[in-house]
């Protein structure tokens, strides 16, 4: 199963595509800072 944030899981466990994960985390952090927390991370 792919979770859309660079993390995919199968019967063996989960793995992270750090290139995608870091890009998404960076984008969310920037959006969070710019809006005071209104955008970026889903709560």
Swiss-Prot record:
GO biological process: defense response to bacterium; killing of cells of another organism
Temperature characteristics of this protein: Thermostable. Retains 100% of its maximal activity after heating at 100 degrees Celsius for 15 minutes, but only 50% of activity after heating 1 hour at this same temperature.
Keyword Transferase: no
A Pfam family matched in the record: Bacteriocin_II
Keywords per UniProt: Antibiotic, Antimicrobial, Bacteriocin, Disulfide bond
Biophysicochemical property: pH dependence: Stable from pH 1 to 10.
InterPro entries xrefs: Bacteriocin_IIa (IPR002633), Bacteriocin_IIa_CS (IPR023384), Bacteriocin_IIa_dom_sf (IPR023388)
PROSITE patterns membership: BACTERIOCIN_IIA
UniProt entry tagged with the keyword Disulfide bond: yes
GO CC entries: extracellular region
Disulfide-bond pairs as recorded: 9-14
Role description: This bacteriocin inhibits the growth of several Gram-positive bacteria, especially pathogenic L.monocytogenes and C.botulinum but has no effect on the growth of a number of yeasts and Gram-negative bacteria.
Family label: Belongs to the bacteriocin class IIA/YGNGV family.
Protein name in the entry: Bacteriocin mundticin
Species classification: Bacteria, Bacillati, Bacillota, Bacilli, Lactobacillales
């Amino acid at each position: 199963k792919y979770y859309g944030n660079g993390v995919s899981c199968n019967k063996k466990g989960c793995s992270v595509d750090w290139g995608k994960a870091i890009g998404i985390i960076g984008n969310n952090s920037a959006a969070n800072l710019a809006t005071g927390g209104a955008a970026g991370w889903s709560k």
